[in-house]
Amino acid sequence: MDAPWRPTASLENLRRRAALLSAVRRFFAERQVLEVETPVLIGASASDPNLESLSLPYAGPGAPPTGRLWLQTSPEFAMKRLLAAGSGCIYQICRAFRA
């Protein structure tokens, strides 16, 4: 009988995923491309009318006047800001959220 707490991914798949991520990171590191991590929660929703953003209530430090933060639909804007600030070549492995 399977316990409901058990992971759904097999150990073999977890190893394959780890190896793939390692290979991707090695590829970019060999080419002097910097890995970055941009915020997942942002103060405004996506400007693309074809994307529906997901928001969450937030009342912590630096909370926006709306009291809500949005889950990023794409890291593109934050990455472009880094490029404009002179970061040089960058890449990111991340999650994006769309309703």
Predicted regions and their residues:
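Class II aminoacyl-tRNA synthetase-like tRNA-binding/catalytic domains
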Residues: 1-99
